[in-house]
């Protein structure tokens, strides 16, 4: 996955693609 989610927050990962 390219996104990391925790406690209702989702962020795109810096090293993706």
Swiss-Prot record:
Record's GO cellular component terms: extracellular region; nematocyst
**Record keywords:** Disulfide bond, Ion channel impairing toxin, Nematocyst, Potassium channel impairing toxin, Secreted, Toxin, Voltage-gated potassium channel impairing toxin
Q: Does the keyword Protein transport apply?
A: no
Annotated site, Key residue important for binding to potassium channels, chain positions:
3
Task: State if Phosphoprotein is listed as a keyword.
Answer: no
Annotated signal peptide: none
Spell out the residues of the site Important residue for binding to potassium channels: 1, 7, 9, 11, 13
Changing residue 7 to A does what? 26-fold decrease in potency of inhibition of Kv1.1/KCNA1 and 7-fold decrease in potency of inhibition of Kv1.6/KCNA6
Q: What is the documented function of this protein?
A: Potassium channel inhibitor that is the most potent on Kv1.1/KCNA1 (IC(50)=671.95 nM), Kv1.2/KCNA2 (IC(50)=167.36 nM), and Kv1.6/KCNA6 (IC(50)=115.68 nM), and less potent on Kv1.3/KCNA3 (20% inhibition at 3 uM) and on shaker IR (15% inhibition at 3 uM). It inhibits potassium currents, not only by blocking the potassium current of Kv1.2/KCNA2, but by altering the energetics of activation of Kv1.1/KCNA1 and Kv1.6/KCNA6.
Further facts: Negative results: does not show effect on rNav1.2/SCN2A, rNav1.4/SCN4A and B.germanica Nav1 (BgNav1), rKv1.4/KCNA4, rKv1.5/KCNA4, rKv2.1/KCNB1, hKv3.1/KCNC1, rKv4.2/KCND2, rKv4.3/KCND2, and hKv11.1/ERG1/HERG (3 uM toxin tested).
- The protein depicted here goes by the name Potassium channel toxin AbeTx1
